[in-house]
Amino acid sequence: MAESMPDSRSGDPGSKASIGRRVPAGAPEQTLPMIIIVTGTPGVGKTAVGKLLAERLGSEFLSLGDLVKTQGLHKGFDRRARSYIIDEPAVRWMLNGYLKDHREKRIVFETHSFNSILHKTHGMVAVVLRLDPLVLARRLKGRNWPKLKIWENVEAELIDLSLYDSLKVLGKRRVYEIDATGKSPGNLVREILIVLHKGKGWSMKSLPNWLEKYDPVLLSRRIL
């Protein structure tokens, strides 16, 4: 599979656009996994952390949102949800082919979900960023998101949806859970590198359950 695809924005069918961005930095950590997925509910800080992690490792950075837009891997724009309708078969074909053809590259991939688009491969791990649901609600409100969409994402965070999806695809040994609440991207990257080097994976003791802290009904009344 080619490293680049025609850029749907250019209008020139012969033009090319790299699907990823090489981030120059220091020497890669040879002991770390080759595919590091940074995932979590929209609004937890995946993009900032993923870019900084890629820079720290001298790795390539890929973002599902960017790929969908720049490569035209969507079926249109959902105005109510304010997001593109992902063409999952197209994304799955392009992304898995790219990863297969570039096994020698370390790649940091940022996405809110990957259970329906990525095949489990050797050297793949997921880092699930978590965020206090009330902090998440305030952050999304600051982005002028509709109340209903804010609640949908807060609810997903409350019930550990991103964590569940990651564990379902990769299993406990390849999933790491990090609480991003009150932490800068730099601090989160340092924490991620520590847990990846330890290589112990996920456990029930990783983080507190948000449902132990918040009553969903009371929280929804504060948001809606």
Predicted regions and their residues:
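NTP-dependent small-molecule kinase module
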Residues: 3, 29, 104, 167-224
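Hydrophobic anchor at the beta1->P-loop junction of P-loop NTPases
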Residues: 38
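P-loop (Walker A) phosphate-binding loop of NTP-binding proteins
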Residues: 41
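Conserved lysine of the Walker
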Residues: 46
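Hydrophobic positions on the alpha1 helix immediately C-terminal to the Walker A/P-loop
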Residues: 49
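ATP-dependent small-molecule kinase phosphotransfer cores
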Residues: 60-118, 214-218
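Conserved phosphate-donor/acceptor-positioning beta-strand/loop module used by diverse small-molecule
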Residues: 122-143, 153
